[in-house]
Amino acid sequence: MNDYQIMRLDAAPRVLFKFDGRILFSSDRFEMVHLSLDPGASMELHTQPFDVVFYLSEGSGILTIGLEELEIQSETSVMVQAGVTRAWKNNGKGMIKILVCKLKE
């Protein structure tokens, strides 16, 4: 077994969402998911039992955290603590791409 793992985005397993999500890495302690949301697409408000760091690599969108809506621009990261409600919405004209890092420990 190797001391490393390589995963190409186009070969990564899909997550079960209504938009394109790919699992780039997953372990008991950490998971990395790449999300792509088309213009107008949004995810439902939800919570997770672990901290999550989002990195918006392309586009801009609305990140709802609790009762607050934040306009997030590309090349920005946001950490949301475990148990806090969150959701993304693409309110722009182009696709947004988000790297989701789940800190499960």
Model segments located where?
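Short, surface-exposed secondary-structure edge patches
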Residues: H34, E44, V53, E68-L70
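A short, N-terminal "cap"/entry segment at the start of jelly-roll beta-barrel domains
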Residues: M1-R29, V33, V78
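Short, conserved beta-strand element in jelly-roll/cupin
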Residues: S36-D38, Q48-L63
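Short acidic-glycine-tyrosine-enriched beta hairpin
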Residues: L67-A82
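Structural motif
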Residues: S60-I62, E69, T85, M95
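Conserved short histidine dyad/triad with adjacent acidic residue
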Residues: V33-Q48, A82
